[in-house]
Amino acid sequence: MAVGKNKGLSKGGKKGGKKKVVDPFSRKDWYDVKAPNMFQTRQIGKTLVNRTQGQRIASDYLKGRVFEVSLADLQKDIDPERSFRKFRLIAEDVQDRNVLCNFHGMDLTTDKYRSMVKKWQTLIEAIVEAKTVDGYLLRVFCIGFTSKDQQSQRKTCYAQQSQVRKIRARMTDIITNEVSGADLKQLVNKLALDSIAKDIEKSCQRIYPLHDVYIRKVKVLKKPRFDVSKLLELHGDGGGKTTEAVVSAEGAVIDRPEGYEPPVQEAV
């Protein structure tokens, strides 16, 4: 065994030296996530992405991101009937530091969905595929439960199979007519107000009384070819550049874009 000093470690070689700590957030940028103008809340949050370097474009990594937001947050409403609905928005384009999103689906929260399933009643579900006027192919899931008659002394409220088939056919007809007769913006407004489920519940009362009728889930199966102008129409003024009024030293009002930073002066 050789006795002596290890020159590599004493001089601070490759193995013994300290690694330079680099903050990973120093090469990332924050982008504002914008919802379409069919919702009251336009800015739903911020997202983080690596800064553009060479052929790695930041906007390419932002497109396709899906954001899940509660309807109560989108509509600035504390109504409990809105809090259990979740809307999915997908990033389709990037304008400056704004990520423009479009509708990508809807779902109910797990706790709400499981709380509706109970004993002594019949669960009726319908799955419908329909296309909107502007070319979006959607798969809509509807759910409903039979309701007990107040005058009845029976513990259960089971429906016959013939009644279940009639109710499911009525659900399919109403959903197909509502989806095929509206564009995506009108359909999202109907989903937010839950008007389709209310029409189904009212229409099926003659067959068998129902309660807890909801559009449980909406999936976007196919979209039309991407058009920037249509996306900008959905966002209106909120998707583009936002300006703020600034009063100069002379008293004139100057409109500056959001996030404006004055240039660095070389000499004072």
From Swiss-Prot:
Chief place of localization: cytoplasm
Subcellular localization: Cytoplasm
Cystine pairs: none
Example of a GO MF term: structural constituent of ribosome
Keyword Amino-acid biosynthesis: no
Quaternary assembly: Component of the small ribosomal subunit. Mature ribosomes consist of a small (40S) and a large (60S) subunit. The 40S subunit contains about 33 different proteins and 1 molecule of RNA (18S). The 60S subunit contains about 49 different proteins and 3 molecules of RNA (28S, 5.8S and 5S).
Family: Belongs to the eukaryotic ribosomal protein eS1 family.
Job of this protein: Essential for oogenesis; required for late follicle cell development.
Record protein name field: Small ribosomal subunit protein eS1
Gene: RpS3A
